[in-house]
Design a protein with these regions (language model features):
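A catalytic-pocket lid/entrance helix-loop region that shapes and gates access to the active site
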Residues: 219-221, 226-331, 458
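Cap/lid segment of the alpha/beta-hydrolase catalytic domain
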Residues: 74, 115, 124-199, 245, ...
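Short, solvent-exposed loop/turn and secondary-structure capping segments
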Residues: 99-103, 129-135, 150, 156-161, ...
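Catalytic-loop region of hydrolases
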Residues: 4, 26-116, 132-133, 284-288, ...
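Glycine-rich nucleophile elbow surrounding the catalytic serine of serine-hydrolase chemistry
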Residues: 209-219
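Secretory targeting and sorting signals
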Residues: 1-26
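Alpha/beta-hydrolase fold nucleophile elbow
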Residues: 200-211
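C-terminal subdomain of alpha/beta-hydrolase-fold enzymes, centered on the catalytic histidine
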Residues: 328-511, 516
Length: 535
């Protein structure tokens, strides 16, 4: 689940932090292996309901691959020891849709460097797929890799060029492409290109994505359960029709309560919450291990003085009321819970900046729900917010909701779904992943049966798609591969980071609903000093 341009205005947090990791389209190559397979265009079979418009090919020498600057995003780090590869770009259309969808497939040119695996990669915010670093990374690991632009271009933040049709209505064909149609097309085309390039079929197909890419992975499991044997879908923006409105909630609260705390004041509440709930796992490490069990109330900070920009400020009851409402998440005027807020401990820097609405939500409401680019989302009231929320559900759940808990067909196909979500995610509320998993549990026989094909891991102290003070996953895709190909289901997910003292910190993250607890002995920085328990 981005970028900014419109957000650049007052971002306290760098824009890059709001986006799933991406790379630029172009790459520069230095040296590399000699090619062993001819890189040229080949005949591509059109997916059902689509027509191939063009096929192009481009050979790359490999070696060290660098990427150009693409502000405001960070430049991806150079990737070394990349084998020579071939890019096949397929452009297709869906008759009557007036769309032009590009699918880029990257293939190791030496057949001996191909593992027989296919990896489709996901996007970020309103970017359906990244044609740069993710593909090169996958090629280095021996995959045939693919990405799609869904026909909506290469900007994760600007939907003005495609969201609305000339008549001012939502461009439904392109929204369908962005939501799910292009993902299935990519799977079909990517496997077909691999077969014709090597003369051998793909043995194992995987999805790999975070944020929007996570939502896309769940869309594939729900809508096209046979496309992938393994799906890695992290920090997923599922239930998009709700999430994409709910993340405006802080603006509504500020507007209605007429209280406008600074980021310094807001983060004082987070600091206090972390201090109060830090030792829930038995260790004081500056991280709330299980925010759902942190019942600290913002009102406890009322009257406390905090230093902000050299000035002493006293926290008021109005400040506390605003913070508690943001943490609780959106509700209707009659008190019905609509969706979730950020966890305690997650930064307020993106979802709660006064007068600066989260750009994903801002664009969604302006272009898709209201169909009016001039609509001001900072003026929403509790009542108008609830009305927009309901309209988004009514008009878009079937198109892009991605909240269907019925994964029966995916289970029957033998698929495996692995998802992790940071407990300090500042963009996509972690409880959305918990809500979805619990709906699947209720529908499909309980957590033990669901664990046979779908596992969720909640990572303490980890921010959106990685980052933050908590241990980061070391090889989630590798864990998924072991599950799919060897039948070794991950009981825990290995994670690691470097502590403030420079020492390595490791954790074996427990699968939901379990949480980690310190055993009372051993090095608190070592994974072996913790056990998984059900609270």
């Amino acid at each position: 689940m981005k970028r900014l341009i419109m957000l650049m205005v007052a971002a306290i947090v760098p824009l890059s932090a709001a986006l799933a990791p991406t790379g630029a389209d172009a790459a520069v190559h230095h040296g590399g292996d000699a090619a062993s397979t001819v890189c040229s265009t080949l005949p591509v079979s059109a997916p059902p309901g689509a027509k191939i418009e063009s096929v192009t090919a481009a050979a790359h020498a490999g070696g060290t691959v660098t990427f150009p600057d693409a502000p405001p995003l960070p430049t991806p780090a150079p990737i070394t020891d990349v084998p020579a590869w071939c890019d096949i770009t397929v452009t297709l259309t869906h008759p009557g849709a007036n769309d032009h969808v590009n699918v880029k497939i990257s293939l190791p040119r030496d057949p001996h460097k191909w593992t027989g695996r296919f990896q489709a990669t996901g996007g970020s915010a309103y970017l359906a797929g990244d044609f740069g670093a993710p593909l090169v990374t996958a090629v280095k690991a021996g995959y045939v890799a693919a990405a799609t632009d869904a026909g909506v271009g290469s900007s994760p933040i600007d939907v003005s060029g495609w969201a609305l049709a000339p008549d001012g209505e939502v461009n439904t064909p392109l929204l369908k492409d962005f939501a799910s149609r292009s993902l299935h097309d990519m799977a079909v085309v990517g496997k077909d290109v691999a077969l014709k390039f090597y003369g051998s079929p793909v043995r194992y197909a995987y999805w790999n994505g975070c944020s929007t890419g996570g939502r896309q992975g769940f869309a594939e499991a729900q809508d096209h359960p046979g496309d992938f044997q393994g799906i890695l879908a992290d920090a997923p923006a599922t239930d998009w029709d709700r999430f994409a409105v709910a993340t405006l909630w802080s603006q509504v609260v500020f507007n209605e309560e007429k209280t406008y705390p600074t980021q310094c004041e807001l983060e004082a509440f987070n600091t206090a919450a972390v201090k109060a709930c830090d030792d829930l796992d038995g260790v004081k490490d500056g991280i709330i291990d299980d925010p759902a069990s942190c019942h600290w109330d913002a009102r406890r900070l009322v009257g406390v003085k905090v230093l902000c920009e050299g000035k002493e400020i006293t926290i008021t009851a109005a400040d506390a009321e605003v913070v508690d409402k943001i943490w609780a998440g959106p509700v209707s005027p009659d008190g019905e819970k609509l969706w979730y807020g950020p966890n305690k401990g997650a930064s307020f820097g993106y979802l709660a900046q006064v007068g600066v609405p989260f750009f994903v939500a801002d664009n969604w409401v302006k272009y898709f729900v209201e169909k009016d680019p001039r609509f001001d989302t900072t003026t929403l009231t509790y009542r108008s917010f609830a009305q927009i929320f309901r309209r988004s559900q009514r008009d878009f759940n079937d198109v892009i909701g991605t909240g269907d808990p019925n994964l029966s067909a995916f289970r029957k196909a033998g698929g495996k779904l692995l998802s992790w979500h940071g407990q300090a995610d500042e963009l996509v509320p972690t409880q959305g992943s918990v809500d979805y998993r619990e709906r699947v549990d209720r529908l499909m026989g309980g957590d033990k049966k669901v664990d046979d094909f779908y596992r969720l891991f909640l990572l303490p102290g980890v921010t959106h798609c990685g980052g933050g003070p908590g241990p980061q996953p070391t090889d989630a895709l590798g864990a998924l591969v072991q599950w799919v190909e060897k039948g070794q289901a991950p009981a825990t997910l290995a994670a690691a980071t470097t502590g403030a003292d420079g020492r390595p910190v490791t954790r074996d993250v427990c699968r939901y609903p379990q949480v980690a607890r310190y055993t009372g002995h051993g090095d608190p920085a070592a994974a072996s000093s913790y056990r998984c328990v059900t609270t």
